[in-house]
A protein has these predicted regions:
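Hydrophobic membrane-insertion alpha-helices, especially the h-region
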Residues: 4-20
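Active-site-proximal beta-strand elements of phosphoester/diester hydrolases
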Residues: 48-68, 219-221, 249-258, 277
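Cys-nucleophile CN-hydrolase/nitrilase-fold catalytic domain and related Cys-dependent amidase chemistry
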Residues: 73, 81-209
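Active-site catalytic loop in hydrolytic enzyme cores
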Residues: 164-165, 185-271, 288-292, 370-376
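Well-ordered, non-membrane alpha-helical segments in soluble/globular domains
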Residues: 67-81, 116, 128-131, 156-165, ...
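N-terminal active-site segment of His-dependent metallophosphoesterases
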Residues: 36-82, 90
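CN hydrolase (nitrilase-like) catalytic-core segments centered on the catalytic cysteine
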Residues: 165-176, 256-372
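Alpha-helical transmembrane signal-anchor/signal-peptide segments
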Residues: 23-40
Length: 376
């Protein structure tokens, strides 16, 4: 009798395990009508043949990341609108928002994930739908928040490949230089024009693709991650900023709040950066209008007199972004690009702006995805 009961239990466990394994392999793409609307919010200057900076403030949601085809559909629609408006040429530098690549961790998942009530539940579905991958990632995780590290690390190889395919493909398809926002990857590197993920700490990095779709230079790692991300995103160990030669001129990149630090502009000055792209990200509903929280990750730079709560988050971004503010920055112009949208219960809502002659453009009401163009 005991033998019979034991065999029955083993059969039941095997059946349950087999059923679970089969369930984890099922991936059905749900029906989703993507919002492809985009408006030209700013068109500053005139075409002098020297190129332009074009920021795409994308409206994004988890459903856009069900497949590369869906995300390509949306981003290609934005870029097609820019091309139809005469804003794309062989000297155009397109800039996308920070973390647009990080969300690729949700590509190709089960419908339960996209239907989750909040981000925490979505992460739960991500883990249980990929049990072996998640377990390996958790065992190799580093930093204070191993869970967040594991969630980002578990699909790093496929995320890097997807990022290369999507953004390198868009750069080639439209014949532009593309600053592909940023992506969180372990020890990213570029080999023969292709982005690869490593096995070390996680870095929030931006990659530039040329008109042939090849990744250029080195991934620009964020020097000073935000206070909220520091438990799993590591600061760049070499504190190095890279300047890349493009058909329009020499381009520097400051990821997110790296644009708040005067010493970073001086570093770009030394490398004769002519333009600066800032892929950026702000979380929280109405955060842009709420009081600025100050420098949380490090001490306030001695040159900065702005105090926490003195102005709104949006006003702080405008004041602390020092592009073309001589003598701190000798760059000719720049652009700061945020995303709009909602990932479950997490909102993103910064307002993109352009910088020229030490001045920034004014905020405007956001009703859809936006294009911001700055002729050089």
């Amino acid at each position: 009798m005991r033998t019979l009961i034991g065999c029955t239990l083993l059969i039941a466990l095997a059946a349950a395990g087999g059923g679970y394994a089969y369930w984890t392999e099922q991936r059905e793409v749900g029906h989703y009508l993507s919002d492809l609307r985009v408006e030209l919010a700013i068109n500053d200057g005139v075409d002098s043949g020297r190129g332009n900076l074009l920021g795409i403030e994308a409206q994004l949601s988890p459903r856009d990341y069900q497949s590369l085809a869906l995300l390509h559909l949306k981003l290609a629609a934005y870029m097609s609108k820019a091309r139809d408006a005469g804003l794309l040429n062989d000297k155009t530098i397109v800039v996308l928002p920070e973390h647009i690549g990080t969300w690729l961790m949700f590509r190709g998942e089960k419908n339960e994930l996209y239907q989750a009530r909040d981000l925490s539940e979505a992460m739960h579905w991500l883990a249980i739908s990929n049990p072996l991958t998640f377990t390996r990632a958790w065992l190799g995780a580093v930093g204070e928040s191993r869970l967040n590290d594991a969630h980002l690390r578990m699909k790093a190889a496929s995320m890097a490949a997807d990022y290369q395919t999507l953004f390198g493909g868009l750069a080639k398809e439209f014949g532009v230089t593309l600053v592909a926002g940023s992506i969180a990857l372990p020890d990213p590197r570029i080999e023969n024009g292709t982005l690869r993920a490593g096995t070390g700490p996680l870095y929030n990095s931006s990659v530039v693709f040329d008109r042939n779709g090849a990744a250029q230079g080195k991934p620009q790692r964020q020097l000073l991650p935000t206070y909220e991300e520091q438990t799993y995103i590591q600061p760049s160990p070499d504190h190095q900023l890279n300047v890349i030669d493009t058909p329009a001129g020499r381009l520097g990149i400051l990821v997110g709040s790296d644009s708040w630090y005067p010493e970073n502009y001086r570093s770009l000055n030394e490398q004769q950066a002519q333009f600066i792209a800032v892929p950026a990200f702000v979380t929280g509903k109405d955060t842009w209008q709420k009081p600025w929280g100050g420098y949380k990750s490090v001490s306030t730079p001695s040159e900065i007199s702005l105090k926490p709560g003195e102005v709104s988050e949006g006003a702080a971004w405008h004041r602390l972004t020092l592009i073309s503010s001589v003598p701190t920055s000798t760059a000719d112009a720049g652009i700061t690009v945020f995303s709009q949208g909602k990932f479950w219960n997490k909102h993103s809502g910064g307002q993109s702006f352009i910088s020229r002659n030490g001045l920034t453009s004014h905020d405007m009401p956001v009703t859809s995805a936006r294009l911001l163009n700055l002729w050089l």
